[in-house]
Amino acid sequence: MTNIDAPVTVQVAVDPPYPVVIGTGLSDQLDELLANRHRVAILHQPVLTQTAEAIRSHLAGKGVDAHRIEIPDAEAGKDLSVMDFIWEVLGRIGIGRKDALVSFGGGAATDVAGFAAATWLRGVSIVHVPTTLLGMVDAAVGGKTGINTEAGKNLVGAFHQPLAVLADLATLETLPRKEIASGMAEVVKAGFIADPIILDLIEADPQASLDPMGGVLPELIRRAVTVKAGVVSADEKESELREILNYGHTLAHAIERRERYEWRHGAAVSVGLVFAAELARVAGRLDDATAQRHHTILTSLGLPVSYDADALPQLLEYMAGDKKTRAGVLRFVILDGLAKPGRLVGPDPGLLVTAYAGLSA
């Protein structure tokens, strides 16, 4: 198991490479990363104001001209009006190309701060300090940034890799159990597409898997980050292989849009994973036991595995706008077996109806 007292590092082998550091008490690493930056802007959510101010004050004590920029919570922050506000503040405080941003918050904060870094002066450095499980295992790793529009989720964005990701496990201690469970959906995804040991660890003790200061969750984080880092290192710009990280996300993004982004991302991904497994099963690509295993594991973590039985027509409309769609043809990442991701292109409408019926039962 991962020792929470001794930070571990997972390298993301892009150009240039960067570390994902997992542990506790990571302030020294932040100091080192920002040592040569004259000016720094810390983008954070309202609930983290006190801690963000402590970071700002600490950096100021080191001679850094540090500023805070507060952004709205969750998906409300991933809006063009928020970006306009951020750009205005970055200009006012004088962030230059040799300066840096710090994202401090959950996955949505990482997405919007990363997009700000990608677009300001055509790209400035950023360090991600995720404070949620979802941020640690997914949003902060891989360089995807973006905001939402009326057309859909994350359709406006850029690839912009960080200087580093600092995943301080101590920040998870104050999170509600539902928030940790939400992040576990992405961990489970990593298990099904690449690392079945993740699934074994969760099945052995689901509740221990949700304990941020126990021995299981840090190991799950390390393994999930390793899966994503490996995929991103091989396919940074999502030309083909990286698409497997979207397992469960085609339906998930449609659900989020239908729910006006009021559902937790992990809850939507959980439903999306079950749907993708059912779709593979009814298509004859996945065995019954592995499909059922999705349902069992996600349920054991308190995550939803069903959705509104009457919602399919609207969800299909939204899925047609998914970024994986080509020439109007739906594409799904599915499994051909445990840790054997594949694609299902242009499935027969009857398959979609049958798979969704299993989901909404």
UniProtKB/Swiss-Prot annotation:
SUPFAM superfamilies: Dehydroquinate synthase-like (SSF56796). NAD(+) binds at residues 73-78, 107-111, 131-132, 144, 153, 171-174. Its main location: cytoplasm. It comes from the Bacteria. Its cofactor is NAD(+); Co(2+); Zn(2+). GO terms for biological process: amino acid biosynthetic process; aromatic amino acid family biosynthetic process; chorismate biosynthetic process. Zn(2+) binds at residues 186, 249, 265. It is found in: Cytoplasm. It catalyses: 7-phospho-2-dehydro-3-deoxy-D-arabino-heptonate = 3-dehydroquinate + phosphate. Its EC number is 4.2.3.4. InterPro entries: Dehydroquinate_synthase, DHQ_synth_AroB, DHQ_synth_fam, DHQS/DOIS_N, DHQS_C. GO terms for cellular component: cytoplasm. Catalyzes the conversion of 3-deoxy-D-arabino-heptulosonate 7-phosphate (DAHP) to dehydroquinate (DHQ). Belongs to the sugar phosphate cyclases superfamily. Dehydroquinate synthase family. This is 3-dehydroquinate synthase. It comes from Mycobacterium leprae (strain TN). The gene is aroB.
